[in-house]
From Swiss-Prot:
Disulfide bonds: none annotated. Belongs to the SsuD family. Transmembrane segments: none annotated. This is Alkanesulfonate monooxygenase. Keywords: Flavoprotein, FMN, Monooxygenase, Oxidoreductase.
Length: 378
């Protein structure tokens, strides 16, 4: 099991839909979140990509020097980046971070945003371009001299002079719910990512991807992208969830949903279909809450509950075949601590940093002794 956190380079706060309780999204805050995740034992952090975010490569490079063990899941963008340039960027980042790079392959899902970046090809053509990109990128990272001509990419005698730290290259993560996306993932990538859908839908998707990978003679790992709201009691957790969206009015929700409907991403459509913009039907599966998706693109669901309940839901996904969990929560600094301190001890997730959490003592009682801890069980 690996557990990643999230660097909120598109903004953060205590509430959605208002500047009340908002936080300045700058390097100092990103560093706080990254260093907390590093100290708490998270495997790594995801950096989002797109016009509403700070550049993920520059942000990851800045944070790598502020952390020691934390890995960085950073996006390459086929169609917006040439594979040779992306290979040099990834190789440099992997070497300078001493092998702490993970690569997120993002084909894009919003034609309006992509047009602003100069990309005008259709949904399925984007995945063809992605396959061409990865054919060249992987060859370069393996140390090959690549000559290739496809419908979207052409290179002659391209090579990489400085190899990455990880061999043959950093792991490739990929999410795509359409058939074209699944085919691209099965041919080229290492970890297939799904949004936080109900377990029965996740199970179906995993089976589909496994079959496609088998046709390619490959096996894959699987990951899931979720928010989390965990508190010491169920009541506190659900109160926190309702408080998070307490400033959202119907006009704000409608405007956000209209913007999200521009997307031609199958995954985004599946996310929107979980709630259809209706705030009265947000618990779509036990402890799986779709409130964040009322106004947020991409990951729109959260596990909500007390530590035992959240751990149980995580283990249910693990039983389906999920190995990589990518979480986030509002505000990201505080929720990183809630998840690590309350839930990590209940999971089969350990490293030298999480072991330090188990040795925490709290404050001395009466300047004389430390309280004895009690470990909950799932």
């Amino acid at each position: 099991m690996e557990i990643l956190w999230f660097i909120p380079t598109h903004g953060d706060g205590r509430y959605l839909g208002t500047q009340t309780g908002g936080r300045t999204a700058d390097h100092l805050y990103f560093k706080q979140v990254a260093q907390a995740a590093d100290r708490l034992g998270y495997t790594g952090v995801l950096l989002p990509t797109g016009r509403s975010c700070e550049d993920p490569w520059l942000t990851a490079a800045a944070l790598a020097g502020e952390t020691s063990d934390l890995k960085f899941l950073v996006a390459v963008r086929p169609g917006l980046m040439q594979p040779s340039v992306a290979a040099r960027m990834a190789s440099t980042m992997d070497r300078l971070s001493d092998g702490r790079l993970l690569v997120n392959v993002v084909a894009g899902g919003d034609p309006y945003e992509l047009a602003g970046d100069g990309m005008f090809i259709s949904h399925d053509e984007r995945y063809k371009a992605t396959e061409e990109f990865l054919t060249v990128w992987r060859g370069l990272m393996r140390g090959e001299t690549v000559t290739y001509e496809g419908d979207h990419i052409k290179v002659e005698n391209s090579n990489l002079l400085f190899p990455p730290k990880q061999s043959p290259h950093p792991p490739l993560y990929f999410g795509g719910s359409s058939q074209a996306g699944i085919e691209a993932a099965a041919k080229h990538t290492d970890v297939y990512l799904t949004w936080g859908e109900p377990p029965e839908q996740v199970k179906e998707k995993i089976e589909t991807v496994k079959k496609q990978a088998a046709k390619e003679g490959r096996t894959m790992r699987f990951g899931i992208r979720l928010h989390v709201i965990v508190r010491e009691t169920e009541e506190e957790a659900w109160e926190a969830a309702e408080r998070l969206i307490s400033h959202l009015d119907e006009e704000t929700i409608a405007k956000a949903q209209a913007a999200l409907r521009r997307a031609d991403s199958s995954g985004q459509k599946r996310m929107a279909g979980l709630h259809n913009g209706d705030r009265s039907k947000l618990e779509i599966s036990p402890n799986l809450w779709a409130g964040i998706g009322l106004v947020r693109g991409g990951a729109g669901t959260a596990l909500v509950g007390d530590p035992q309940t959240v751990a149980t839901r995580i283990l249910e996904y693990q039983a389906l075949g999920i190995e990589s969990f990518i979480f986030s929560g509002y505000p990201h600094l505080e929720e990183a601590y809630y998840l690590a301190e309350l839930v990590f001890p209940l999971l089969p997730f350990q490293n030298e940093r999480t072991k330090k959490l188990e040795r925490r003592l709290g404050e001395a009682m009466g300047n004389d002794h430390f309280a004895r801890g009690k470990k909950a069980k799932v």
